[in-house]
Amino acid sequence: MERKSSLKVRVQKLGTSLSNMVMPNIGAFIAWGVAASLFIATGYLPNKALDTNVVGPMLKYVLPLLIGYTGGYNIHKQRGGVIGAIASFGAIAGSTVTMFIGAMIMGPLSAWILKKFDEKVQPKIRTGFEMLVNNFSLGLIGFALMVLAFFVIGPVVAQLTEWVGIGVEAIVKVHLLPLANLIIEPAKILFLNNALNHGIFTPLGTEQVAKVGKSVLFLLEANPGPGLGVLIAYAMFGKGSAKSSSWGAMIIHFFGGIHEIYFPYVMMKPAMFLAVIAGGLTGTFTFQTLGAGLTAPASPGSIIAIMGMSPKGWGPHLVVLAGVFAAAVASFLVASIILKSDNSDDDSLETAQAVTQAAKAESKGQAVTEPNLHSDITTDNIHQIIFACDAGMGSSAMGASILRDKVKKAGLDISVSNQAISNLQDTANTLIVTQEELADRAGQKTPRAVHVAVDNFLATSKYDDIIASLTNGKASGSENAAHSTQADSAEIDLNQIDAVVFAYGIAKGSATMGQETLRSIFKQNNVKIPVSTASYAHLSDYNAKNILLVTTIAQQGQAQQAAPNAQILVVDSLVTTPEYDKLVARMHK
């Protein structure tokens, strides 16, 4: 078990090291994609001068140099970035093909060599000679590696790139490209999505764009169709909180491009892997058959970003949409069969996530522990909170935003940020929040930090426990508050309620998702009560006994102070909670 776990972690690290060279530079790829779609001969605004002097040089020099610099920086900070760019330039100049792979090799390699040199030499430098040695060592080592890259790395990588390109073209010609989704879809759920998309498909796809103006490779991993189909199936045929929360998850997944949000829905029923694979196969087959492609990577994988990166004209946009919706239909059909044939009574998303977490821990040879928070989570021990994920953006940014709002409302002076796991620094007085699947890597990277693992960055109940711990509240007190809330909610009669209002602070996201969840439950049960959202600053407008305010444990006091006459439902999470179903059930008694 340990060998499998360590192998999995090593594969994740390798994939992450590749994606971490590309992800920070996605904006540059998008800028180049926009320039290409506008100024090449078949673009919206053909311009030979800009095509020759901007689009071409940016592809050949700027993008690979950015990758080389970033790869070096990730190894040895600024000095590593500089020597990474120098060495990468040698590979670029020594080849006629776009040297993304060469930059991915020379950037980290040259930075590692310089780092080892610095570790050996810097402690022996006499006072006053530091700048001289540092500058000349970087320059001379960089020069040597640049020449090596020009004569060796550039030509070798060019030949390898040509062979890979021939292989991809052969696969496309015999219509076998859809089979790639047999690997892609399960790999996404195992948090290798960024490694696949930005470590493999982005370099190869950019090469294709330079030749034919578009590439289907940009659509293989970014296609939101498979996840959309699964979420629609849960919305129609699911049970409990998995059903009610799927509507909000759909919005974040399809329009926000945060694909991680549908991963728990797949992991709670392993047969759902068949649904996303079916969706991926169908979508890629449709893309390939209709000749779909994008001009640059779509990051995040939002339908908005995908449409923005589609080539000129209605036709290219429509064929991309056709592939997305074909994938959604296929995954929906398979997921629907799985859900309708499932006779289990318990279909709680929270329960399934807990079971999944325990199964993962057992499969990694770890002890299955109770989900209590670490006793060291106090204001004396924690000075910063970092949400860490594979790429350091997307889902972790959403989680950081949610907790940052809670920290501010609690009056705590603690910074909350998000980073890629590979960029974490092992410092004390730090709380690292990461997904269970990535907890091993985060623990290895920062052994001195306090760690909290969640199955979903939107699982805000743990965030309330973190706030309770930081404000010197005991875990048992949090549990008592939850039990008190449940007892109080039993007294709420929807027959006496004329409106339901979800309260929010600065960020409105979770309140909007909760609003859509409750609306869905009301619609299914033919309840005609309007549901809306309101900021805490305007809750006084709803200070009446026939109004039900929905808030979280951390903000309960603020809601009661603003609207003392209103009825208040306090929940662990505005997004997924069993209290909504219980309210409706009591109404019909």
From Swiss-Prot:
Subcellular location(s) of the protein: Cell membrane
Positions annotated as active site in the UniProt record: C389 (phosphocysteine intermediate)
Keywords: Cell membrane, Kinase, Membrane, Phosphoprotein, Phosphotransferase system, Sugar transport, Transferase, Transmembrane, Transmembrane helix, Transport
Enzyme class: transferase
EC number from the UniProt entry: 2.7.1.197
Membrane topology designation: Multi-pass membrane protein
Transmembrane regions: 26-47, 52-73, 137-158, 168-188, 276-295, 318-339
Cytoplasmic topological intervals: 1-25, 74-136, 189-275, 340-589
Functional summary from the UniProt entry: The phosphoenolpyruvate-dependent sugar phosphotransferase system (sugar PTS), a major carbohydrate active transport system, catalyzes the phosphorylation of incoming sugar substrates concomitantly with their translocation across the cell membrane. The enzyme II CmtAB PTS system is involved in D-mannitol transport.
Domain comment quoted from the record: The EIIC type-2 domain forms the PTS system translocation channel and contains the specific substrate-binding site.
Subunit structure: Homodimer.
Protein name (Swiss-Prot/TrEMBL): PTS system mannitol-specific EIICB component
Gene source species: Streptococcus mutans serotype c (strain ATCC 700610 / UA159)
